[in-house]
Design a protein with these regions (language model features):
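Metallocofactor- and cofactor-centric catalytic cores in central/energy metabolism, strongly enriched
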Residues: 1-128, 136-176, 180-298
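Glycine-rich, N-terminal phosphate-binding loop of Rossmann-like dinucleotide-binding domains
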Residues: 84, 304, 320
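Glycine/Thr-rich phosphate-binding loops of Rossmann-like dinucleotide-binding domains
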Residues: 90, 310, 325
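Structured mid-domain segments that build the active-site/substrate or prosthetic-cofactor binding neighborhood
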Residues: 294-309, 314-317
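Single conserved hydrophobic/aromatic residue that forms the stacking wall/gate
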Residues: 314-326
């Protein structure tokens, strides 16, 4: 998988002749400890540590900023954290990529004005219409202090969490299973909001698709048996509140799944919805190539289409398995 990464930009005073040279080690160390902090404390949804990419050079001017930007584009960097302990050339060094999420950490030190650069570059970001988060410590640190104060640590991690979340969901989908339920406006999925605000697409799958996959067996039978055994061993049923009631025929006829088959249906439905959202390579092996792809979802919703169980599939819990078209 190509993970969304956070790029660390070590920004430095571009004046050679003793100034820049004296700041290289400190600036690079800030970049390293920021990357270490993020990777050791944050994970992607699959449990993998968040990956950081440190710029291939310290950034003292526009030429080096462009080199690092090109590097980051190749690495799928979705957000940048610029770090510095000194004054730097503001608009010559800032991240001007409109597609990255940005933050700047200015070191609050005893010797050089990290705060001055931070204030200047934040003004530049605002002027150019490129929003950035400002990170600055409350307490003054010694120039050689390589620890990250608690307030700075929290700000960096908050920024990184949000940035990774945006990167993870970008160009994925919110999958609506069903449609608007009984005219309830709150269950309507607004595709414009998802696209323009969250950067994800909206997709719809009719709930009949769940019944279709159950009826003809479009799921992994081995995974189903394993899941069903787990459910029987670990899930306890509550009492039946309708037991003994004289229910109207319209209700009893709607119960097309026998009570003793409820768990089988639920397990199949759960696996199928998972496959719809995220895909399943096992289905490809079984010959169900389109279904194996899934919908590249980051999330999904069961919209509660009321009529979906009106389709009475008599043998729904005992699927036949026709040979798929190869």
């Amino acid at each position: 998988m190509r993970y969304p990464k956070i790029g660390i930009r070590p920004v430095i005073d571009g004046r050679w002749g003793g100034v820049r040279e004296s700041l290289e080690n400190q600036t690079c160390e800030m970049a390293k400890i920021a990357a270490k902090l993020i990777s050791e404390n944050l994970k992607y949804p699959d449990g993998t540590p968040v990956q950081c990419v440190i710029g291939c050079t310290t950034i003292g001017g526009g030429a080096e900023a462009a080199r690092v930007a090109e590097q980051f584009q190749m690495e799928n960097v979705v957000a940048t954290l610029s770090v510095t302990a000194c004054w730097c050339y503001g608009t010559e060094t800032f991240d001007m990529d409109p597609n990255t999420i940005k933050a700047v950490w200015g070191f609050n030190g005893t010797e050089r004005p990290g705060a001055v650069y931070l204030a200047a570059v934040m003004a530049a970001h605002a002027q150019r219409g490129l929003p950035a988060f400002s990170i600055y410590g409350h307490d003054v640190q010694d120039a050689k202090d390589t620890t990250i104060p608690a307030d700075v640590l929290e700000k960096i991690l908050r920024f990184a969490r949000g940035a990774v979340a945006v990167g993870w969901m970008t160009n994925k989908a919110y999958v609506n299973i069903g449609a608007v339920a009984m005219g309830i406006a709150g269950s309507f999925c607004d595709p414009d909001v998802l696209q323009k605000y969250f950067g994800i697409r909206a997709e719809w799958v009719d709930e009949v698709e769940i019944l279709r996959r159950i009826a003809i067996g479009i799921y992994d039978p081995e995974e189903y048996e394993k899941a069903l055994q787990w459910v029987k061993a670990n899930c306890r049923e509550g009492f039946d509140k309708n037991l003994g009631k004289d229910l109207p025929e319209v209700i009893t006829k709607s119960k097309i799944i026998p009570a003793e088959k409820d768990w089988e249906f639920i397990v199949k439905m759960t696996l199928i919805i998972r496959d719809i959202l995220f895909g399943n390579s096992r289905l490809d092996e079984l010959g169900w190539h389109e279904e194996a792809l899934g919908h590249n979802a980051v999330a999904g919703g069961f919209q509660g289409q009321r009529q979906w169980t009106d389709l009475s599939l008599i043998h729904i819990s005992e699927p036949t398995r026709p040979e798929p078209i190869s």
